[in-house]
């Protein structure tokens, strides 16, 4: 198994920036994750003692009205149908990260109206 990992690392080292960007996008789509999530969490960890001026909107549960929640997620994020469905199916997941308090409340209200359970972090 170590040999396979070494081959993957060697391929990544040889790839161009554009190829690496495409790889990251493909991984995000395939696994329903975002590359920005760990970076935002690390940055927020050190600033928690300061006044909280940005929030992550987390979809905790889609509830019974999953189709309505998918539509709301698409409207809010601009994601395609497949990506929005993947995000909703993968709950809990962040819908938006690092948004202002007012925008976070608006997003929360829209998603809760659609039937979702939302947590602001």
UniProtKB/Swiss-Prot annotation:
Gene Ontology MF terms in the entry: mRNA binding; structural constituent of ribosome
Keyword terms of this UniProt record? Ribonucleoprotein, Ribosomal protein
Biological processes per GO annotation = translation
Q: Which InterPro entries match?
A: Ribosomal_bL12, Ribosomal_bL12_C, Ribosomal_bL12_C/ClpS-like, Ribosomal_bL12_oligo, Ribosomal_bL12_oligo_N_sf
NAD among the record's keywords?
no
Keyword Ribonucleoprotein assigned: yes
Output the HAMAP family linked to this UniProt entry.
Ribosomal_bL12
Function (record text): Forms part of the ribosomal stalk which helps the ribosome interact with GTP-bound translation factors. Is thus essential for accurate translation.
Q: Which family does it belong to?
A: Belongs to the bacterial ribosomal protein bL12 family.
Q: Which NCBIfam families match?
A: L12
Q: What's the protein called, per UniProt?
A: Large ribosomal subunit protein bL12
What organism is recorded for this protein?
Streptococcus pyogenes serotype M1
* Taxon lineage: Bacteria, Bacillati, Bacillota, Bacilli, Lactobacillales
């Amino acid at each position: 198994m170590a040999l396979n990992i070494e081959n993957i690392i060697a391929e990544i080292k040889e790839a161009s920036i554009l190829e690496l960007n495409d790889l990251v996008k493909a991984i995000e789509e395939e696994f329903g994750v975002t590359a920005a999530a760990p970076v935002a969490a690390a940055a927020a960890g050190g600033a928690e003692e300061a006044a909280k001026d940005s929030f992550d909107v987390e979809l905790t549960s889609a509830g019974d009205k999953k189709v309505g929640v998918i539509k709301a997620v698409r409207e809010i994020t601009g994601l395609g149908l497949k990506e929005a469905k993947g995000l909703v199916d993968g709950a809990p997941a962040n819908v938006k990260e690092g948004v202002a308090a007012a925008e976070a409340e608006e997003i929360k209200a829209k998603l809760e109206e659609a039937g979702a359970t939302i947590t602001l972090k």
